[in-house]
Amino acid sequence: MNIIDFFELSAGEWFSQRTIHNLVSGELQAGKSEVNVEILEKTDPTLINLCEQNQVDSSVTKLIGVKISWNGTNNKGQVKDVGSRMLIIIPNFDDLNQGQLLQNRGNGNSPKISGRYIMGSDDVLMLTTESEGLYVEERFWYLIPNLRLRTSVVNRPQGFSLASFCSEIRRVKS
């Protein structure tokens, strides 16, 4: 599987359950979300805007734009978690399995976040991003086409660290 196949398989509606561990305090949180993954056209204004902010030509053939939206709760339903982010995947010219990652939250006017991706020979996607003192490493993989797993580790200055595990089940329409 290459990066294009991975994101095409990701398109659709998902139910996500997650557990988040604060590695410093030991606090544990659980949450659930409805997640929608949409592949963007290269003519999408938000995609073009993020590309322009990063001096990237949005007409690059292999470029992939993805919008991820979620609506859920954390901590036994006490904290609402609603948002979206856009990812732009820019494969290396000579290797679709590695490349640059651009992302933002929401409407395209938020601070840009950049990083790298590697699509492993084991079909595990690893995203690494850094911005404003934040370092995030995420891993995604499919057990079957309708069941995706995700882990992440978030590190901030002053020793703040989180680790999470998510299982995501595709909503299949009858």
From Swiss-Prot:
Alphabetical UniProt keywords: Lyase
EC number: 4.-.-.-
Matches recorded under InterPro entries: Calycin, CpcS/CpeS
GO molecular function, one term: lyase activity
Top enzyme class: lyase
Zinc is among the record's keywords: no
Pfam families reported in the protein's UniProt record: CpeS
Superkingdom: Bacteria
Family statement: Belongs to the CpcS/CpeS biliprotein lyase family.
Its job: Covalently attaches a chromophore to Cys residue(s) of phycobiliproteins.
Annotated HAMAP family: Chrphore_lyase_CpxS
Name of the protein: Chromophore lyase CpcS/CpeS 1
Gene (UniProt): cpcS1
